[in-house]
Amino acid sequence: MKDTLFNKSLNKRFCFDEKVAHVFDDMLERSIPYYHEMLNLGAYFIAQNLKENIHPKPLPKPLIYDLGCSTGNFFIALNQQIQQDIELVGIDNSMPMLKKAQEKLKDFNNVRFECMDFLEVEFKEASAFSLLFVLQFVRPMQREVLLKKIYNSLALNGVLLVGEKIMSEDRILDKQMIELYYLYKQNQGYSHNEIAFKREALENVLVPYSLKENVALLESVGFKHVEAVFKWVNFTLLVARKT
């Protein structure tokens, strides 16, 4: 379904409710440059990590968490690239999103969804975690706590994927990057009003960090190897490995 949610001002802060869930896939594809390429790239690194079996004590059945899994797109990408027996757990606090995900992945028997606040979940030991365009919605004070919890739950040599919208630390460059991104959205069919109304709804809800800040945050919780494997203007995909 086409995203026309912001044809008029919502007069409220953005939230992942039923109206958003209905158009969310279209919103992602038209709002995140190279969205599917980043999903496939992230799935590749997790698949390679499992295939090369570089864990000192591999888990009997690799467990992968997708936090803020929304409509389950990343699990489709993972199942296309991973041949071995795995367990996929998607966690999201939006039931409308999870209903879409369950419908989309009903034919996969290795997927389980939980409607919970992932900040309150006690994770099992896992081979990989993904936070794809999710950390930017977590309150800044809680980000380090969440990442530390993920780090502690990762198996040795496990990986964390972090996809984020980012900002520049240079004021002029940041303005130019935002302007280019708005041009991108216009080319995807969004009007000036839709762009402005969405920006208004996301104010103080989506809080981006710079690339340097995100890397520093990951390093501060223990990750010694953090790589930006993809970047387009103000979007990036990071792979962090626990060693």
UniProtKB/Swiss-Prot annotation:
GO terms for molecular function: carboxyl- or carbamoyltransferase activity; S-adenosyl-L-methionine binding. Keywords: S-adenosyl-L-methionine, Transferase. S-adenosyl-L-methionine binds at Y35, G68, C69, S70, D92, N93, R199. Gene3D superfamilies: Vaccinia Virus protein VP39. It holds the Pfam family Methyltransf_25. Its EC number is 2.1.3.-. GO terms for biological process: tRNA wobble uridine modification. It catalyses: prephenate + S-adenosyl-L-methionine = carboxy-S-adenosyl-L-methionine + 3-phenylpyruvate + H2O. HAMAP family: Cx_SAM_synthase (MF_01589). PANTHER family: CARBOXY-S-ADENOSYL-L-METHIONINE SYNTHASE, TRANS-ACONITATE 2-METHYLTRANSFERASE-RELATED. Homodimer. NCBIfam families: carboxy-S-adenosyl-L-methionine synthase CmoA. Belongs to the class I-like SAM-binding methyltransferase superfamily. Cx-SAM synthase family. Catalyzes the conversion of S-adenosyl-L-methionine (SAM) to carboxy-S-adenosyl-L-methionine (Cx-SAM). This is Carboxy-S-adenosyl-L-methionine synthase. It comes from Helicobacter pylori (strain P12).
